[in-house]
Amino acid sequence: MEPKRCTFGASGASSSSFSPFSPLTEQGVPATTSAGVVAGCPLLPKGQLKKIRSTFILKKIFWHLKEKKKLETIRYNKSTQKRINININHYKEYTEKYSSIEIEMKPMENKYGRFININKEYEEYYHIYYNDNKKEQIKSTSLNKNDKVSKINIIIDYQVKSFNNLFYNCKCIESICFKKFYRNNITGMSNMFYGCSSLTNIDLSNFNTDNVTDMSGMFCDCSSLKELNLNNFNNNNVTNMRCMFSGCSSLTNINLSNFNTNNVTNMSCMFNECSSLTNIDLSNFNTDNVTTMSGMFCGCSSLTNIDLSNFNTDNVTNMIGMFSVCSSLKNIYLSNFDTSNVTNMYWMFYGCSSLEKLNLNNFNTSNVIDMSDMFNGCSSLIYLDLSNFDTSSVFLSNGMFDMCQTALLKNLKKKKISSKLKNLINILLNKLNN
């Protein structure tokens, strides 16, 4: 059975559904304390810092976006006030009609140049707060499908440091435009548009990415996005592109012609489940420093050709599921692949059901310990060159040739291949004959 999601992370494969990120999740508000309740939220006991509770209190304040709400003063102790870094002492009565389909957003200023930092001992919780026509910055971008906001204009007119999780799971937003972008020192954009499943248009022409180091999951699960032009991106300092476009299942065109990947070390699941992508040009990619490519093209079921002849894989150790479930793939060019440091090729070509020829005579597999299901489901494969396969370190090889043609297996048996591979083929042929 073919998997629906790529299950490969930086540390290997998992049998559970793919969930590469674990940002702060919604939970219920903690029980009311003896200090009482203000604005529907429990107060913190005097002199104590309830780390996780402070998060829920803050979220509760801004959560109800569709009704008239009076936000009253909440008496935080000094320690909590210092940690939250926002002024919550003077709120006015606020009424929101919520009929507008376009909202202009602006980050909330604080001395750290961040949106919010709840507690440094926990994962930093970033969310932008936007202005209404009264300039009261009290609403979050945690928007769901039943909310009416569909278009957002962003104005960044002062320095901020991180956009991590900025629009995380904003499922209702269809269009985002960065109208003004202050030249800044932003270093993080991981999960920035993660889960924006209604997003069809995004204008990044004013984007400044000069100092960004992390773009992991940046467009993950933007399942309605059809086109993406990142021609102006400066990626000189980026080291992590893990799952950057994972789950962009409607994406048919992506321009990466100016991508600088010189410093990238992680490309795992980068194009995972880009199932509508029919062509991808990575001829300018520099992969000299990449160490993991696991699941990089997993589930790219519309790709028919992949040319990676320019790829330098000298430092790559993990190729788990790299081309798994590329079910339309007919041609793949890996002539320059150096696999001398690779230890895991599990699922590497799993489910490549249209692939007819595969020449791997340049593969150095002396350090590979797992080849399980490597060619499983390659049901159209009629030519496979494994003449230089060194299986001396292989510990796992179960399912390696499952669902391959009998003719291919018989042909391989006649070739000069390792005794481990011959034994594996003999066992499989005996099963097929019985």
Regions found by a protein language model. Give the residues of each.
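Acidic, Ala/Val/Gly-enriched low-complexity intrinsically disordered segments
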Residues: 10-13, 29-31, 35-37, 210, ...
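Serine residues within intrinsically disordered or low-complexity segments
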Residues: 11-22, 216, 224, 246, ...
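Structural signature of tandem-repeat unit edges
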Residues: 45-48, 67-74, 90-94, 150-159, ...
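Short beta-strand elements of solenoid repeat domains
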Residues: 168, 191-195, 217-221, 243-247, ...
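Intrinsic disorder/low-complexity segments
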Residues: 11-14, 30-32, 36-40, 213, ...
